[in-house]
Curated annotation (Swiss-Prot):
The keyword RNA-binding does not apply. HAMAP family: CH10. This is Co-chaperonin GroES. CDD domains: cpn10 (cd00320). SMART domains: Cpn10. SUPFAM superfamilies: GroES-like (SSF50129). Belongs to the GroES chaperonin family. The gene is groES. Coiled coil: none annotated. It holds the Pfam family Cpn10. One of its GO terms (molecular function) is metal ion binding. One of its GO terms (cellular component) is cytoplasm. GO terms for biological process: chaperone cofactor-dependent protein refolding. It comes from Ruegeria pomeroyi (strain ATCC 700808 / DSM 15171 / DSS-3) (Silicibacter pomeroyi).
């Protein structure tokens, strides 16, 4: 099943968080924070102005992005957990 976001929505795959601290301690899953960065999997075509003019998306598939801790809605596609969020929830592109 493929999921294509509509309008100004973006589908993001979270990057995995570190398993160990800098000191070598292993972090259990229950203590890990969900990462607030990920890779864009798919994008909608963009939002539209009242005049109907399309506002192009600033992000594209493959971009590494930074987003807020509580951004997006978790969705499962083909057994993989992804986040669906508005483009405005993305704070920046990591280069």
């Amino acid at each position: 099943m493929a999921l294509k976001p509509l309008h100004d929505r973006v589908l993001v795959r979270r990057t995995e968080s570190e398993e160990k601290t800098a000191g070598g301690l292993i972090i259990p899953d229950s203590a890990k924070e969900k990462p607030s960065e990920g890779v864009v999997v798919a994008c909608g075509e963009g939002a539209r102005k009242d005049s109907g003019e399309l506002i192009a998306m600033a992000v594209k598939s493959g971009d590494r992005v930074l987003f807020g801790k509580w951004s997006g809605t978790e969705v499962t596609v083909d057994g993989e957990e992804l986040l669906m969020m508005k483009e405005s929830d993305i704070m920046g592109i990591i280069e």
